[in-house]
């Protein structure tokens, strides 16, 4: 099986033995849209890569970053506050009535443009990029230009979440002074690394 995401904020579960089926358009399962209710393809939807992990009970998890608020019609069994700017959504790959589905598990706290997470030792490391992703404005219309986007960007925040519930365990607060564009985290030797637009590399680890 493989999973892909889309800017309309759906996940698509496919069989790698025949992706798309005989008609090249049939998947195993498609989630309803869990964000991007306003169909905003600039500042909402899934823009980053997915993550997956296998827990001790043998459950396969799929985690998706997303931008924008949670869809009002989509319900997660575990929530962690109101999600307005983005976050991480977690699903389990499970058999339901004889068919394989992506079953919603939890949604994270609000993050300023949720970006791709990494899972290590039962902890989800995720971040909000702080980037201004607007591409059109009421005063000038379409204006996807650095002169507008950079000044309106803020700063990234790194989060540690419980992988089973999405509960926040820690965040970097205002430590990180800049934002980033389509970046990825790295986790190695008990440390988490995140780079930012201003050329800085931040490293976090457990205090000894």
Q: Model segments located where?
A:
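Extracytoplasmic/lumenal domain signature
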Residues: 1-208
């Amino acid at each position: 099986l493989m999973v892909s995401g889309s800017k309309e904020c759906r996940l698509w579960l496919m069989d790698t033995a025949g992706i798309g089926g005989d008609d090249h358009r049939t998947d195993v399962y498609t989630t309803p849209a869990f964000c991007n209710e306003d169909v905003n393809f600039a500042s909402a939807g899934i823009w980053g890569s997915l993550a997956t992990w296998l827990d001790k009970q043998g459950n396969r998890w799929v985690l998706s970053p997303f931008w924008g608020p949670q869809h009002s019609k989509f319900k997660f069994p575990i929530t962690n506050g109101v999600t307005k700017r983005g976050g991480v959504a977690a699903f389990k790959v499970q058999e339901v009535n004889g068919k394989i589905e992506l079953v919603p598990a939890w949604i994270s706290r609000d993050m300023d443009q949720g970006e791709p997470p990494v899972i290590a030792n039962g902890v989800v490391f995720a971040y909000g990029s702080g980037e201004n992703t607007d591409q059109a404005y009421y005063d000038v219309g379409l204006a996807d230009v650095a002169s507008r986007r950079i000044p309106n960007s803020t700063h990234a925040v790194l989060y540690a979440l419980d992988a089973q519930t999405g509960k926040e365990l820690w965040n970097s607060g205002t430590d990180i002074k800049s934002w980033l564009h389509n970046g990825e985290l790295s986790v190695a030797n008990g440390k988490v690394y995140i780079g930012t637009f201003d050329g800085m590399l931040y490293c976090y680890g457990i205090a000894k």
